[in-house]
Amino acid sequence: ADVPGNYPLDKDGNTYTCLELGENKDCQKVCKLHGVQYGYCYAFSCWCKEYLDDKDSV
């Protein structure tokens, strides 16, 4: 089953890029900014588990 989630967007409407795939401290911080406890780097963008609202840019 697919885990729900999404790519959060910054204030300019862009995804957060990342270089270190998988577990990524920067992405963890980004996801916590968006109110989600866990995230990782997938396809060079931060992806947040169970993050559904892609309109809540920070």
Swiss-Prot record:
Disulfide bonds join 18-41, 27-46, 31-48. Gene3D superfamilies: Knottin, scorpion toxin-like (3.30.30.10). Residues 3-58 form the LCN-type CS-alpha/beta domain. Signal peptide: none annotated. The keyword Secreted applies. It is found in: Secreted. Its main location: secreted. PROSITE patterns: LCN_CSAB. One of its GO terms (molecular function) is toxin activity. Keywords: Disulfide bond, Ion channel impairing toxin, Neurotoxin, Secreted, Toxin, Voltage-gated sodium channel impairing toxin. The keyword Repeat does not apply. GO terms for cellular component: extracellular region. Expressed by the venom gland. It holds the Pfam family Toxin_3. Beta toxins bind voltage-independently at site-4 of sodium channels (Nav) and shift the voltage of activation toward more negative potentials thereby affecting sodium channel activation and promoting spontaneous and repetitive firing. In mice, causes intense writhing. Has the structural arrangement of an alpha-helix connected to antiparallel beta-sheets by disulfide bonds (CS-alpha/beta). Belongs to the long (3 C-C) scorpion toxin superfamily. Sodium channel inhibitor family. Beta subfamily. This is Bestoxin. It comes from Parabuthus transvaalicus (Transvaal thick-tailed scorpion).
